[in-house]
């Protein structure tokens, strides 16, 4: 993308954020749908770091005695609920978490996984044999899409989630969430094996009694813990 195209993209997104904020101010209504842009505002982490204040985001890492890294590069207000899931799993496994902390338009902080090159994430990925990444996508149906390069384990995980009462499916490498790109941060580990878990907005909302930035931390419910326990059981049984 040229510099002129990048500037135009940023201007468009800023205008959108202004209009969305005006809508909220005038009506008190905040749309629950997630707006997706065909192009991220920032082409990589260095680009984001150059243009965003440090208090707009947070990076949380924890190294555990485990060959599994839980990766959540779109946490906080970017893909709500993935931060809380990652932090819960950090009690047992290594974790890298990038969180959007802006008051609005956290989607501007979304850097697609193929371009996500935050130094600590790259370093942690290289030290672990396997990566399980957590993402969110917009869907009114409670559902889980499971991709990644570790296709056999992805199928097993989908089967386990379905047995535990969730709706889940393993997706092909050609799916838009397939996660097979060589430069995908989740694939930059020792083995190149990854599982990419995409959780619908409806399912993430169901995991909390109050699905807000401030409310999620203290309103985790049975669905939340059923998900994390299912994933932990899967890791114990398959790695």
Regions found by a protein language model. Give the residues of each.
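Function-determining sites in protein domains
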Residues: 14
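Intrinsically disordered, low-complexity segments enriched in glycine/proline and serine/threonine
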Residues: 7-8, 17, 132, 201
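N-terminal catalytic or cofactor-binding beta/alpha core of small enzyme domains
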Residues: 32-239
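Bacterial N-terminal signal peptides
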Residues: 17-29
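N-terminal secretory signal peptides that target proteins for export/translocation
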Residues: 1-11
